[in-house]
Every structure is written in C-alpha cells, then in structure tokens.
Amino acid sequence: MLDILKAIIFGIVEGITEWLPISSTGHLIIMEELLKLDQGDAFFEMFQVVIQLGAILAVVVIYFHKLNPFSPKKTQKQKMMTWQIWIKVVIGCLPAAVVGILFDDWIDKTLYHWYVVALMLIVYGILFIVVENYQKGKEPQVTKFSQLTIPMILIIGVFQMLAMIPGTSRSGATIVGALMIGVSRSVATEYTFFLAIPVMFGASLLKLIKFGFSFTAMQVAVLLVGMVVSFVVSIVAIKFLMSYIRKNDFKAFGYYRIVLGVIVFLFFGIQALLA
C-alpha cells in the first residue's frame, strides 16, 4: 500500500510539472531520491512513462473537439482547419522525432545526470525572464494558430528537440522558442500542448517496447493509480495555465526554475561531497 501512496504523489507531481514550464524531470529526480518505489529501477522508468501517458491523455480529452477532424458538428471549412493543425503539429515534431529515434539511448545514458538537470533548469529560467523582458510592451506577431508559418513551426520544433536534454522542460523549451519569434502566449502554449501528443505517445511507446509488458498485480495497480492521478491533475494544471497566461507572463516560472535548479545543485552536490 505504501507504493500506492507514492504512486499518487508521483502522479500529482507529474500532472502539475508536465504542463507548467518547470520541468517534470527536475522534480521527479528529487522525488525519486525521497520516495523511491520498492519495485526496482527498471520498473520506475516504466512508471515514469505510464504517468506521462496519463498526462498526455488529459490534452486529448480537453482538446478532443478542436483536434478531431471527423467531428460531424464541424463544417467542411472547420474540418480543413483541423487538418491544418495536425499538419503543423507533425511538421513541428519532425526534429524531435528524428533525434529521439537516433539518440534516445545515448541521451538517457549520457545526459540524465542531476547536474545537467540543474543547469538546464537555471538556463531556461533565465531565458524565460530575458525573453519576457525583451517582448514587454510589444504586440505579438502571431495571435492565431492559422498565422503560424512553416519556418516558425520548424524553429519551435528545434526547441522541442533541445528539450530532450533532461531538466529543460518540453513545454518550457517550446514556449520560450515560440515567444522569441513573436508568438502570443496563448498560441505558444496551445501549440505546445498539441506538439506533446505525438512526441510523448511516441516516446512512451518506444520505452514500453524496450521494457516489455510483464508486471505483477501490485505493479499493475501502481501503474494504473499513477496514470489516473496524473490524468486528473493534468486537466486541472492545463486549465489553470491557460487561464493564468491571459493576464500574466511566464517570468514567475522562470524565477521558480532558477530556485529549483539551485536546490537540485545543493541537494545532490552535498550528497556527492559527503559520499
């Protein structure tokens, strides 16, 4: 039962941090140290994948009508606009898809270290503050999804590719990239959510294939609880973020990332010195 309670806590953390631009990895790397599941390291990696699936399903549910090109309630023009959204999502995912397929194992083995996570938390925290200060008072060039051009999409896609570095935050990287080229906060955030669907489903499927599907009854319970909690909390987090950015900028998240990065440095740095 203790692992079930831990799964609930992990699900809450994943649901919040996957969509707010504050790095789910940065939080989970500390959580893993404080609340390690008694199921082995391989299972924990699988658990992380499954709770991510719960998070991405929340986006699918919230935006199902907007992203469904087969809806009988849509006119022919609306269906065409929906297909255009998917085309832009697929193009934006290409850089991350190519790098993920070729270098997934290398990234996990080489870059998944606490000091990389801490550094990326701080770097992108500073970026958020700098970009928001630079854009202050300027009218965004892109205020509608339809105004996103192919070059813009590819630039945002490259930022999503860079988010494969642990601690970067996939949502954080793509939002920063979009803001830098004049995309409004609401369009940048929604596009980030849409980009997550194929990328996270693809990444999750890749890891599920690697780890296999053989679990004990307790492990199945832990996976299901974590996924459901992550799904529910993600719905709340997504709705909160879309409401928050209507009146606020992203600087608060930038400051939070810097503080968390320093905490990660201190937490693991002191452990390393005392070891």
Give the ranges of each region predicted by the language model.
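Multi-pass membrane proteins that catalyze or facilitate reactions on polyprenyl-/lipid-phosphate substrates
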Residues: M1-A275
